[in-house]
């Protein structure tokens, strides 16, 4: 009898921990927002562009151009005095409850980032209990945020997925950008020892044709989206300048976020005579103090594979490989040093030079932190030293030209 009573009590108690359905949400009641674009009008109002997934049109998978002639997403543009007002006004256009739990991309207008900064936008997003701060953050470069969220893409059905995948692939293979999310930016701004840097994204082509399904069905799309440079902000969250092409890859080297990229080196009169595919790398920022003033020693260790050769090298000769390694070292040091000069010229430390000094010399940092960017950074001695090791020369030693010459 006692056992039966205990069993009954346990069964009753178990009911307490069982999940209920009081807060259930039907898919047909939700407008799943995959991306948010934020622009400003000429009269200083905000315009939100909400990229909403059409579930029935992506049921066949996430790759391909869409379900027939039906777009996989719909984009609603709402204007308001602030972001909160614009979101409330969305109820006049969208028949379902806005659902931000799956938002994986936020795009901010370049002009807005320059004139107003990030504080107000980030504050609005971070306050929403449903919004994920792991959403990727990009700046619309030379275009409106509207175009980044509206353009339909031929390979990935959901445009926000295309942006995320491109950033992943570019960061992993090309080294020209770094993928940043909202949380990364919030942490950087809160730390106040370095400034945030955010990847740029641009639209190439005809924006009017890019929003039609024809853009996904053409072999040569009339509009495409492309990762484009790094936007450098100050510690207050205002966009100050851009790093593009070699400048951006130099910054990624300094941030120690290179996964794979390539290094080209000239040989005599032959431009880009040899190309090294980087397979492993490690960048260390070593702070030192000299006569009470800081300086930074940048150590870059690189391993890679010979990827392309234009000059008839004798690659089976260790002395030739050693000479090529020196040429690659020189080129990499030049590339990084060029970026360092631009960083010092613009007086914004987004790499974290100051942070390394703070960690090793906290007492000295207290005296420098208030004037670090304006006084110390422009005069900071930064020595760059690269050490490259050629792991392999590919599937062949000598170039084909060299082989034909020997024959």
From Swiss-Prot:
<dbReference type="InterPro" id="IPR008844">
    <property type="entry name" value="Spore_GerAC-like"/>
</dbReference>
<feature type="signal peptide">
    <location>
        <begin position="1"/>
        <end position="20"/>
    </location>
</feature>
<keyword id="KW-0564">Palmitate</keyword>
<comment type="function">
    <text>Involved in the germination response to the combination of glucose, fructose, L-asparagine, and KCl.</text>
</comment>
<comment type="similarity">
    <text>Belongs to the GerABKC lipoprotein family.</text>
</comment>
<dbReference type="Pfam" id="PF05504">
    <property type="entry name" value="Spore_GerAC"/>
</dbReference>
<dbReference type="InterPro" id="IPR046953">
    <property type="entry name" value="Spore_GerAC-like_C"/>
</dbReference>
<keyword id="KW-0472">Membrane</keyword>
<keyword id="KW-0309">Germination</keyword>
<protein>
    <recommendedName>
        <fullName>Spore germination protein KC</fullName>
    </recommendedName>
</protein>
<dbReference type="GO" id="GO:0005886">
    <property type="term" value="C:plasma membrane"/>
</dbReference>
<keyword id="KW-0449">Lipoprotein</keyword>
<dbReference type="Pfam" id="PF25198">
    <property type="entry name" value="Spore_GerAC_N"/>
</dbReference>
<keyword id="KW-0732">Signal</keyword>
<keyword id="KW-1003">Cell membrane</keyword>
<feature type="lipid moiety-binding region" description="N-palmitoyl cysteine">
    <location>
        <position position="21"/>
    </location>
</feature>
<dbReference type="InterPro" id="IPR038501">
    <property type="entry name" value="Spore_GerAC_C_sf"/>
</dbReference>
<dbReference type="GO" id="GO:0009847">
    <property type="term" value="P:spore germination"/>
</dbReference>
<feature type="lipid moiety-binding region" description="S-diacylglycerol cysteine">
    <location>
        <position position="21"/>
    </location>
</feature>
